[in-house]
Amino acid sequence: MQVLHVCSEMFPLLKTGGLADVIGALPAVQIEDGVDARVLLPAFPDIRRGITDAQVVTRRDTFAGPITLLFGHYNGVGIYLIDAPHLYDRPGSPYHDTNLFAYTDNVIRFALLGWVGCEMACGLDPFWRPDVVHAHDWHAGLAPAYLAARGRPAKSVFTVHNLAYQGMFYAHHMDEIQLPWSFFNINGLEFNGQISFLKSGLYYADHITAVSPTYAREITEPQFAYGMEGLLQQRHREGRLSGVLNGVDEKIWSPETDLLLASRYTRDTLEEKAENKRQLQIAMGLKVDDKAPLFAVVSRLTSQKGLDLVLEALPGLLEQGGQLALLGAGDPVLQEGFLAAAAEHPGQVGVQIGYHEAFSHRIMGGADVILVPSRFEPCGLTQLYGLKYGTLPLVRRTGGLADTVSDSSLENLADGIASGFVFEDSNAWSLLRAIRRAFVLWSRPSLWRFVQRQAMSMDFSWHVAAKSYRELYYRLK
């Protein structure tokens, strides 16, 4: 079984979000699992530099101009690169300029990605062609459409990492992207009078996956579907929509081997975690106090992530004797709010604006509770890292958060399945009640340790997801 992942970023070469983590981990595990998985990416500068053994496969003139297809390897995974400097050789973000304006030629840049994904199934590399083209998010959403236009030379899977990003472009671009105008149709890639790369993937793929079972259900409902609920309900009825939970890359995220921690530990040596907490308190300017529960946030600061609720609930958290360490960037209003809280409560609130991968490991190793109060969360990786590190996740019941964290209720404690704290409603009162439950459990150290061990014993390795995808590929074949 030969599978080509078509996508726009890959950790650690280039990362703007969780998609990169998935592509950085899943193909390698699939190879271990017996699937010949390769990855197709645009040759953005950071990616091009990271693939040091890239060789020319072929050169082509395309609707987007001349391209060179390169092939190399990264961490044992075969990587195809679309080398088109006039489209991809730009500094900074792959999607927008330094003023945060989307590149005006994004329609061409990402149509080309989908087109090359299809052409790979038509023999662009004469020595390797995929049985399945697995496209990820809107950037690769045209790949299933091009495959449909070419008579479906391979099966296609389209994975939704976040339905909120739809890849919308004016209709007149149909003349430029080498797809028949007949595809610009309500039964096709047209959405609200525009081309939607996302809808293209949803409509033309043989199967759609979402990155958690709960999110797969949620996106059939109007409040989560952004207007796509009719199509997604139809795909659900046809058995062509399912959820496959993302995993954790245990080579990178494991407290037993994590060299970024001051003190490494396992579920049997959890007392070693205390040194990480002490170092984190020092680094964040917090009072060094092993008796104060340390709550943490590692997140983009946006309304979607529910960080406004944390600001609202913060006085209640601090009154009970808790501390907060925050690492993140985003909404200027939220940034100012957290910086003001840090100034008002020195020793209790520490804030770092920005994102540093290495420091996120130190927070995960040192905190007691990781807050993920998202309004919606397709899968979420932060809570999975928390479980892995014995840093109990406090989450809202939505998407992948609902699939991965069990509340420390009395019955769940009795059944041995408690792994964190879960609240229902997207408001500060509901969040504060969950924070209160965390304080109650914290006051019972042996129970807290029991839940930590339970959380750390859960299996969210990529091997589970790889098995699900392999079964799906063979079903399609």
UniProtKB/Swiss-Prot annotation:
Top enzyme class: transferase
GO molecular function: alpha-1,4-glucan glucosyltransferase (ADP-glucose donor) activity; alpha-1,4-glucan glucosyltransferase (UDP-glucose donor) activity
Binding positions for ADP-alpha-D-glucose per the UniProt entry: 15
Catalytic activity: [(1->4)-alpha-D-glucosyl](n) + ADP-alpha-D-glucose = [(1->4)-alpha-D-glucosyl](n+1) + ADP + H(+)
Signal sequence, start to end: none
Top-rank lineage group of the source organism: Bacteria
Cited NCBIfam families: glgA (TIGR02095), PRK00654.1-2 (NF001899)
PANTHER family: ALPHA AMYLASE DOMAIN-CONTAINING PROTEIN, GRANULE-BOUND STARCH SYNTHASE 1, CHLOROPLASTIC/AMYLOPLASTIC
Family: Belongs to the glycosyltransferase 1 family. Bacterial/plant glycogen synthase subfamily.
This protein's name: Glycogen synthase
Protein source organism: Escherichia fergusonii (strain ATCC 35469 / DSM 13698 / CCUG 18766 / IAM 14443 / JCM 21226 / LMG 7866 / NBRC 102419 / NCTC 12128 / CDC 0568-73)
Gene: glgA
